[in-house]
C-alpha cells in the first residue's frame, strides 16, 4: 500500500485517525499496509471494504496491538467495516483507553444488520467526554436498480442516525467510503 502523502508529525494530546477503503484487507497487507500503518502512528483506525472473516482480520491487524471491532458482512467477500484502537502507546507515549465502553454494528434498521456497512464504538476521552467513532461503507449504486434503492434507503437511515448520535455522545466522528460524489 503506497501513499504519496508523507506522514504528518505528531502533535501531543491530539488523536490521530486514519480511514481507508482497503478493497480487501488481505490485498492491502500484500501491498505493505502494515508498513504504511506503522508509519502513520494512528490511534484510531477505520477500514471499509474489509472483505474478510473476523479471524483473518484479527490475525493481520495483530490483536496484541489493536482492539478491533469488526462488522463482517453476511455475504462472503463483501463489504465489512471496522474500528480499531491501538493497545500500545503512540510515538508521543499516549494511549486512548483501548476498550470501547459500548459498541453497535447496526444503523438501526434490521434490513442492514448483517450488511457489514456500519459500526459504532464509544470511547471515553482523557477529559471524561465520550467520543463515538463510526466506520461506514455506502456501496455505489446504479440508477434504476434495487442496489440504488438500497443505497438511498441506507443514506436515509444515516440521516436519522446522525442526530441520534449527536444526542448520545459529546463528540461524533463518522468516517468511511460514502460514495456520494
Regions picked out by a protein language model, each given a short descriptive name:
Residues 31-34, 149-159:
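Conserved CoA-thioester-binding segment of acyl-CoA-metabolizing enzymes
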Residues 1-63, 67-69, 73-81:
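N-terminal, active-site-proximal structural segment of metallo-dependent hydrolase catalytic domains
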Amino acid at each position: 500500500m503506497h501513499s504519496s502523502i508523507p506522514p504528518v508529525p505528531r502533535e501531543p494530546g491530539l488523536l490521530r485517525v486514519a480511514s481507508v477503503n482497503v478493497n480487501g484487507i488481505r490485498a492491502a497487507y500484500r501491498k505493505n499496509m502494515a508498513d504504511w500503518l506503522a508509519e502513520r502512528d494512528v490511534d484510531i483506525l477505520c477500514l471499509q471494504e474489509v472483505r474478510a472473516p473476523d479471524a483473518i482480520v484479527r490475525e493481520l491487524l495483530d490483536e496484541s496491538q489493536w482492539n478491533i471491532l469488526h462488522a463482517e458482512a453476511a455475504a462472503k467477500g463483501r463489504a465489512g467495516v471496522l474500528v480499531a484502537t491501538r493497545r500500545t502507546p503512540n510515538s508521543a507515549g499516549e494511549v486512548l483507553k483501548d476498550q470501547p465502553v459500548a459498541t453497535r454494528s447496526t444503523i438501526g434498521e434490521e434490513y442492514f444488520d448483517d450488511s457489514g456497512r456500519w459500526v459504532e464504538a464509544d470511547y471515553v476521552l482523557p477529559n471524561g467526554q465520550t467520543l463515538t467513532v463510526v466506520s461506514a461503507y455506502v456501496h455505489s449504486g446504479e440508477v434504476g436498480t434495487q442496489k440504488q434503492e438500497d443505497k438511498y434507503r441506507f443514506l436515509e437511515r444515516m440521516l436519522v442516525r446522525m442526530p441520534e448520535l449527536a444526542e448520545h455522545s459529546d463528540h461524533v466522528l463518522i468516517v468511511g467510503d460514502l460514495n456520494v460524489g
